[in-house]
């Protein structure tokens, strides 16, 4: 859609040293079609083929890019499966986050209060089909049916809001499935959550998981590309099947085994993040 409507846009008159398409799709198309620069860089954040991108829709825009960065090894493999001829100029560039800022802001007051009773689950991300919140509704219902006192908090806006709210009402768990919308500071919620759940249909490399690890969360994630590079199953989290039963079973394991949850929290907090290589990649493009 963006490629169609951008065809009539004017080319920016000024020439830049470096133009960066921060994400696949609209950003990449705009940089290719309308920005003049000595060098161009594109970032890929998602499993390219599963996200619906094709060579036909791209119109080979990436041929014009000097470097393509993917956020994980698996994302790189998926992109190269679509563009094998671009392998030489495709490199991995891991997400950069500010750990000190995240830890500092996690002590601030929450905009919305979380329940003091039962188990607090948290998921952060846009309300889209990819993120799998519809399956989360059914997983929560299974947990409630199994007798667990659980509240699931969702931070994020998106096109699925009304559909998810209606589904929660239909399944009778709307008092426990809390669609809080986007908040300026999500970090106190990570800190207060008992378990962070990231059960998505497909993924690139999740910044939300990185943030949860910085704040020492016990994490459950679906076993898909991206998540597999961030979670070592059984060591610092659980990789679960992307079904209501699979997600519910993973959550139950942590609820009924507090020692395991503690182990995962400690392992998450101990993860070391080094951004030096990523920064050198960007600096190298400006030489």
Where are these predicted regions, by residue range?
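Carbohydrate-associated surface elements
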Residues: 74, 96
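Short acidic/histidine- and often glycine-rich active-site loop of Leloir-type glycosyltransferases
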Residues: 211, 223-234, 238-239
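A conserved mid-protein helix/loop that constitutes part of the nucleotide-sugar donor-binding site
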Residues: 119-142, 148, 159-165
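A short, well-ordered alpha-helix in the C-terminal region of glycosyltransferases
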Residues: 246, 260-274
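Conserved acidic donor-binding segment of nucleotide-sugar-dependent glycosyltransferases
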Residues: 233-234, 238-245, 253-258
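C-terminal alpha-helical cap of glycosyltransferases
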Residues: 272-287
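Short hydrophobic beta-strand element within catalytic cores of glycosyltransferases
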Residues: 218-221
């Amino acid at each position: 859609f963006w490629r169609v409507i951008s065809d009539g846009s004017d080319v920016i008159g000024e020439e830049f040293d470096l133009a960066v398409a921060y994400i696949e799709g609209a950003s990449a198309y705009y940089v290719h079609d309308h920005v003049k620069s000595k060098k161009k860089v594109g970032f890929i954040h998602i499993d390219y083929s599963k996200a619906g991108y094709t060579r036909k829709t791209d119109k080979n825009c990436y041929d014009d890019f000097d470097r393509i960065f993917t956020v994980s090894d698996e994302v790189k493999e998926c992109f190269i499966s679509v563009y094998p001829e671009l392998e030489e100029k495709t490199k991995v560039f891991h997400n950069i986050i500010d750990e000190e800022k995240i830890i500092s802001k996690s002590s601030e007051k929450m905009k919305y209060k979380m329940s003091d009773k039962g188990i607090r689950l948290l998921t952060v991300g846009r309300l889209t089909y990819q993120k799998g919140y519809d399956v989360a509704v059914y997983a929560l219902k299974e947990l409630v049916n199994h007798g667990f006192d659980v509240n699931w908090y969702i931070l994020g806006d998106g096109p699925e809001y009304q559909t998810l709210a209606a589904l929660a009402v239909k399944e009778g768990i709307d008092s426990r499935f809390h669609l809080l919308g986007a908040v300026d500071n999500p970090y106190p919620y990570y800190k207060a959550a008992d378990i962070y759940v990231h059960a998505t249909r497909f993924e690139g490399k999740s910044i939300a998981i990185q943030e949860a690890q910085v704040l020492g969360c016990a994490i459950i994630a679906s076993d898909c590309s991206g998540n597999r590079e961030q979670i070592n199953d059984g060591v610092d989290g659980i990789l679960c099947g992307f079904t209501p039963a699979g997600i519910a079973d993973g959550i139950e394991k942590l609820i009924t085994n507090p020692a395991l949850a503690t182990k995962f929290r400690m392992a998450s907090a101990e993860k070391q993040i080094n951004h030096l290589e990523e920064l050198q990649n960007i600096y190298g493009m400006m030489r």
